[in-house]
Amino acid sequence: MIPPGARAVIWLLCTYPETREADERVQAAARLQRTLGLPIWLFGSRSAQYPTPVEQTLRNKLVAAGVPADAVACSIELTTAVTLDTSQEAVNVAATARARGIDALVCVSNRLHLLQARALLRRSGLRLILAPTPLRDRRWWYVTVRLVLIPLAMLGLGHRFPPLVLLRRARARLASWPV
């Protein structure tokens, strides 16, 4: 799993914290933290959909699942970079890992999300250990978007995909979702 002598962290990827799938990811990350003794990093997306930051909601769930609070680090504690989507999250996680001497990431999410993250980080030099959880979000648009973003990420275009850039800019300006 993790190479001997490697410095590793658990990276919990999650954008929608109030779902059954998110709860399963939190439980998986908590089990891994107890088993491996590694810290958990949260680089949750900023979303106007939730009144509190996504990563803070996830931290609260992890602590409720028995993870020590000091074993969970939110992106605001690790970097000043903004994270609005998986592409930015991957860039920020890789930069933070390099700056902190981390060699390996144990990545927790559903398989589609993990494939995208792996594609985005394929040239980062980081060892990725994938810890997939079940895909519960089977909305047609979610699956379709992930299936489009995976090959774009493999081509190195994920962060420059025009619809994603426009969405990212719109999300950055919203204090709350339009009613």
PLM regions with names:
Residues M1-V145:
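A structural signal for short, hydrophobic/glycine-enriched beta-strand patches
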Residues W140-A170:
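A transmembrane-helix-recognition feature enriched in membrane-embedded lipid enzymes
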Residues R168-V179:
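Active-site cores that bind ATP or allylic diphosphates and position pyrophosphate for catalysis
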